[in-house]
């Protein structure tokens, strides 16, 4: 029985979701201790991290779009079996940097494979394991890419170098997901300074998951 909770962090490149995640972890760790599990996709264990290197390697320019989508799904399956599911069975709070919505947005819309096709593929890969809460860090695609150029030159990967039109398609898909799943996906204004982004995200988490996240991000604990 899965008694824990899965919170996923989503957003276009340069939205700052990973920085926000790290700041949130710093606030929640004293409160939750071992009940908090932090992971990422693709990755989260040895096999999935190996797949991550293949996917994001800038030299793998010959990779077919469907191959890319299948690799993400394969990494996700291993991640669930080896990392996420055991944590949820242990009543832990799992914070995951990207999940299914990323595949729908990036491969389904960005690559043009089809959002429904990618969703269906991932339903098979995940056996229907859905996030309890998704924080969508929203920022304009052009702003996000500019942030990457300014602050992440040494970390630019194969998807970061796609044309702006690709990233606009990704952002549009995220907004459709937000509209289609309002109970699960909550928008965070990622154009704000980081401390305000973190505050807004923690307020959402506290309202949705009070068993794990105290009001004011656990600062009163």
Curated annotation (Swiss-Prot):
Enzyme Commission number, as recorded: 2.7.4.9
Reaction equations catalysed: dTMP + ATP = dTDP + ADP
UniProt-listed InterPro entries: P-loop_NTPase, Thymidylate_kin-like_dom, Thymidylate_kin_CS, Thymidylate_kinase
SUPFAM superfamilies: P-loop containing nucleoside triphosphate hydrolases (SSF52540)
PROSITE patterns: THYMIDYLATE_KINASE (PS01331)
Gene3D superfamilies, per the entry: P-loop containing nucleotide triphosphate hydrolases (3.40.50.300)
The entry's keywords: ATP-binding, Kinase, Nucleotide biosynthesis, Nucleotide-binding, Transferase
Gene Ontology CC annotation, any one: cytosol
GO molecular function: ATP binding; dTMP kinase activity
Sequence positions that bind ATP: 11-18
GO biological process: dTDP biosynthetic process; dTTP biosynthetic process; dUDP biosynthetic process
Record-stated family: Belongs to the thymidylate kinase family.
Function, as annotated: Phosphorylation of dTMP to form dTDP in both de novo and salvage pathways of dTTP synthesis.
Protein name, entry field: Thymidylate kinase
Species per Swiss-Prot/TrEMBL record: Lactiplantibacillus plantarum (strain ATCC BAA-793 / NCIMB 8826 / WCFS1)
Lineage: Bacteria, Bacillati, Bacillota, Bacilli, Lactobacillales
